[in-house]
Regions:
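Conserved ABC ATPase signature
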Residues: 45-49, 53
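Signature (C-motif/LSGGQ) region and adjacent switch/coupling loops
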Residues: 5, 42-45
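Short helical segment in ABC ATPase nucleotide-binding domains corresponding to the A-loop/adjacent helical element
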Residues: 5-13, 135
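Conserved H-loop
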Residues: 99-105
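Catalytic Walker B motif of ABC-type/P-loop ATPase nucleotide-binding domains
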Residues: 70-73
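A short, proline-enriched helix->beta-strand linker immediately N-terminal to the Walker B motif
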Residues: 64-68
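Conserved ABC ATPase "signature" region
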Residues: 16, 20-41, 93
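Hydrophobic anchor residue at the start of the ABC signature
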Residues: 59
Length: 176
């Protein structure tokens, strides 16, 4: 099993190895790990780090590729609530610093409203379609605790819940 550094560096070498010198590749790897707060664990192996740290290494590996669009499928789903919140906050900061667009799949309503500028809600089933799109007009940076009572946050959250528990059910019945 590879260390945190080697895990990210392997991907960096594959993508940039032909065009960049070794010192540049090393610097790119270290910068990606620093971006997700993992500089202190460069030489740690998977069995030596937590689940949240493993997620951050995966995010660092993806960000090191300098993607215009970062695709994330339930990236925080298996984490405890505090680790999830910390990584969500880190992701908000990373997006500000890198300017990357993130497309994330999540089943967590609060996560969707906190992290998104737009929420695309899908209908159920194998023939799922776009059910509704909610624009989230919250200012950035976003402060999780302050948002709990923010009327715009509450309104967006309510829109998502209404779709999931009322209109979504209606869409399903029409399709059947």
């Amino acid at each position: 099993w590879l260390s945190c550094f080697d895990n990210v560096h392997l991907a960096v070498e594959r993508v940039f190895g032909a065009a960049e010198e070794k010192p540049q590749l090393k610097a790119r790897t270290e910068a990606a790990l620093e971006l997700v707060g993992m500089s202190h664990a460069l030489h740690k192996r998977p069995h030596e780090i937590s689940g949240g740290m493993k997620q951050r290494v995966g995010i660092a590996r993806a960000l090191a590729m300098e993607p215009k669009v970062l695709l994330m499928d339930e990236p925080f789903g298996a984490l405890d609530a505090l680790t999830r919140a910390r990584l969500q906050d880190e992701l908000l900061g990373i997006v500000v610093r890198t300017g990357s667009t993130v497309v994330m799949v999540t089943h967590d309503v609060d996560e969707a409203v906190l992290l998104s500028d737009r929420i695309v809600m899908m209908t159920n089933g194998p023939a799922a379609t776009i059910g509704e799109i909610v624009t989230v007009p919250l200012e950035r940076p976003r402060e999780r605790v302050a948002l709990a009572e923010d009327p715009t946050y509450v309104h967006c959250r309510k829109q998502v819940l209404e779709f999931l528990y009322t209109r979504h059910g209606h869409v399903e019945k029409e399709a059947a």
